[in-house]
Structure formats: C-alpha cells, structure tokens
Amino acid sequence: MKGLALCLVLSMATTMAFAAGGAEAAPASPAKSWDFAKETPLADVRIRQALAYAIDMKTITETLFEGLASPARSMTNVGAWQSPKLTEYAYNPQKAKELLAAVQWPADYVLDVVTYYADQQTADFLTTVQDYLSKVGVQMKWRLLEGDLAAQLWVAPADMVNGPSVVKWDLAYAAVAASAESEFYVRYGSTAPNNSHTPKDEVMDKLLEGLNVVDVNTQIKAMHAVQERLNEKLYSIPLYHQIAFIYVGNLLDIKGTVHGNDQFSYEKNILNWEIKRADGTMYTNTGPKEFWEAPITNPGLYAYQEYLFDKLINADASLTPTTGMLAKSYTVSPDGLKFVFDLKTDVKWHDGKPFTAEDVKFTIEFMARTNSFAAVNYKSIVGAEDYVAKKADGISGIVIDGNKVTVTFAKVNPNASLVFSQWPMLPRHLLKDSDPMTTQTDQFWQKPIGTGPFKAGEFVRNNYAVLERFDGYYRKGTGNIQKIFMSASGDNDPNLMVNAEAGKIDYAWSKSTADAKAIGKLPNFTVTKAPIRYTRFFHINQFPHMPNVK
C-alpha cells in the first residue's frame, strides 16, 4: 500500500509539473445549449481526442504501475499485429484545451466514469486521471459498479444509428482479455450484441468482415486496417497493456504445469496436483462475490469457471486448441466450415444426469443470444442469424446424429476452434427455461452445475466459496486435492497480500504490480510473470444520453 501511495504522489507531482508550464485557465467555452436527449458532446471525435491528449499515460505507467505496464496506442500490443501507422495521442494538455474550446465543451458537465475494479490501484489510477482532466477544464466523477455487470455495461441500443443509449454512463474504465486479436475489435461492429457505446459505422463494419480469413498474413493486414480506423475515430481510448502474475505457494506441487494466460481456460492437470495439507484443501482467489458469474462474458476469468465446467475442446498454455475434452475426438473439414464432434459417453453433470448431444446444441443456441464474443462467432453458423432473430426454432447448421454433433459455418471463422475450447457446455435440463439475456438472475447461478472435475459447495456471498472434488468425473488423476477454497475477488484481488501472509493462498493470479512486488518478497512463494493479451481502456458512450452527474 505504501508503494502505491508513493506512486500516486509521484504521479500527481509529475502532473502538476507538466501543468505548470501552461498554467493559464482553459478558454471559456462559448455558451451552447446541448439537447442531451438527442446528442452528446462525446459523439464529436475532437472531444474524444482531447480526453486522450489530457492523460499522461507514459508517466502513469512509469510511476503508478512501476514500469510493469506500457502505454497503449491501440488495443493490440506492439508487434506484427499492430499497425505502424497509428497516431500516438501523447500527453499534450494545450492541444486538449484547444479541441475542447473548438467544440464548446460544456464546462459544467461532469463525466460519469464507471468501473468494475475494486482494488486500490484502480482507485489510484482513476483519481490520477481525474486530476489530469481537471487541468484541461473537464470535470469527472467515478463510481464502482456491482451486480449484473453485463446489464449495466454491454446492452446495445435498439437503434444503432441514433440511439438513445441504454447504459447509464459516459466512460467505462474496462478491459479486454482477448483470447484472439479479433476479440479486441468485434465489439465495435453495429451488430455486436455488446456494443453499447459506438454508433453504426459502415466503414468499420466492412473492415471487420475482412478479419474472417484463415491466412495469417491477410488477417494481419485486415487487422491493421481496423486499428487505423479505430485510431482515427477514437471510439475508445486505449490506455495501457498489462501482464499478469501467477503465485504458487510452497505447500503446492503443480507437477510441471506450464503457466499460461489465467484469464482463460487451459490444461493445468489440476487432478494431478498435490497439496501438503491433511484435509486436501487448496486455497486460491477469484471466487464468486455476489453470485457465481455465468461463463458468458468471461468464460474462464474466475477459478470456478474453469473447474466447474468443461469445454468441447482442450487448449494448451498458449490457448492453442489441442485434443478433445467433452468430445472424444473432433475433425475440421479442409475448408474450415464444418466441425464434427464425437462426444464422450461417460460424462455426467454434477447432479448425475448424463451429458448429451442435446446439451451441445442447446448451449450454442443459448450463447448465440447473449452479449458475448462467443455469440459473435456462433452467429457465423448456418441458420444462426435467423434463430437469433426468432425466425427459426433452432440453428439449422447444428445437426445431431447419436453422440456426434456437426456444426457447419456459413463463412470461415478463424476463431471457431478457440471458442469451442473456451466457452463451456451448459445443462439443457436446468437452463432450458432461462432467458439468455437475463440468465445471471436465474436461480441456477446460486449453485451452478457443470461437468467439470469439481462441483459447487458452500458459498458465503462476498466472502468465500468452496469447490468439492466430483467423484463422478470421467477422469481421475493422481493428485490429492479434495477441496478448493476460493476467496471472493476479481482479477485484481484487494485481499491477496493479506491472504498470502495468512497462509490462505496456494495458487493465485492477479494483475496488481504492487501485489507482485510484495508477495515476491515472501520466502514461501514463487511469482511468475505471464504475458497476456490484455488492454485497459476507456469505452466512450457516443449515443445520446442524459447527464448522470447533476
């Protein structure tokens, strides 16, 4: 905590030093009457550019994040997949003031900034941004969202051209943990079910279509074009790229498991892990808070999502799809349009019911009607668009023949294998009457049932939850873990250091640089840096909406 406080002081001091050179007040905005029911200043690209110019991300990453994050020019990190033609919106408060004056920014408007991160580093970051914006004449207040986040953040307007907005915020401090590069960008399409922020852009829609190719070089060129459009229009403000940290205590033997991106599911062989505790309990973080989050927006962010639910296909530490999981085997046609899954016949749900091909068909159809990256990909299946539009009773491109399920895509989807390895199967017999758009409120998610190696046990809201080894699992393993005790947290765990010192962490992960430094000093932990495809940014709500802060 002291380190974070010091970083914040340094950041604030740097801010004031920069501001001192041009200390004149921002030019007074000429009076303009804004009809917020029909327009928002945030729809003007100059306002979005001004906000970007006003924030010194170089200083913030060097101080607050202690050099363990890097300023972002796009959602994609530096490398072959990032376009070399992108404009860098480097810190320039005078430019920000000029742009705000040109658009007649309403000086009494207070930006309503929301986030779902409850850790101290987020509070420090947003307080620092608040200070930067005030230097150019922009007021801002931020607040923490709780409860059903998808309903508060990612509901698209009925009219993607004119709005109005469904969500109630100006800026959302959020992140994308992308399983594939395209996952960063599909949310800007006018048909994306989670596009709550960016009005229809026909040019962007066409560029996004260009990502649906298999050849890597062609896909990279298409990705560059999408990035350049987003960089020009600045529909969101990329802030910084982060790495993750994985912590393993000395009581746990993970038997050579290769660390990967713990924001997603990959083969950890947890059934072979051994814990030096007589009761076989392993302690970890990322447990449920108010409820067990449905694996829709985040299919593997929380520990329980990976251990409660299995997928059709397995993946290795690099998230490359490998062998079958719930599928005994699978094949892909040479043109990449047809997947055939030969399902295992000895799989049971945690309530003892058999897992069947009907569960596979149900899950894909269920997910196609959600606000998720999976839905965007499933809509490429033959007949999916008619099903989502309620013009058909099912997706015609999904065909069941005994224990075999054939899924036929209407067009090449380079992310299909990835989606099948990340989004789990769900029980038809328990969720068939649940509305996909509001499923998080279903009683099922108070104690979910999956096909994974562990089943849901005791749950104390905003405190902890317990997973118990499932005796009916189709694989056995050689390890001795009988229970997993999960402290309630997101991917930035405010109690991680406290729990580590108290002996209540054996395996955990987070993105907090402060935690990484502190836990790294403990003699009984190994800390591993894990490169991840992860970018924090500000989503900007460009649909008409009334001011939330009065």
What is each of the regions a protein language model found here?
Residues S29-I47, T63, L207, Q242, ...:
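A bilobed periplasmic-binding-protein/Venus flytrap-type ligand-binding module shared by bacterial periplasmic
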Residues K38, A43-V45, Y53, S70-A102, ...:
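Structural transition elements
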Residues N377-D433:
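Surface-exposed binding/hinge segments that line
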Residues A50-P84, Q121-D131, A158-P288, A303-Y304, ...:
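Detector for C-terminal structural segments
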Residues P41-A43, K328-A374, T406, N499-A502:
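Aromatic- and charge-enriched surface segment that lines or borders ligand/interaction sites
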Residues D35, T40, Y247-S265, T286-E306, ...:
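A structural "hinge/loop" feature
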Residues T284-V332, E365, I449:
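N-terminal lobe/hinge region of extracytoplasmic solute-binding protein
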Residues A26, Q139, D442-W445, G472-A518, ...:
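Ligand-site clamp/hinge motif
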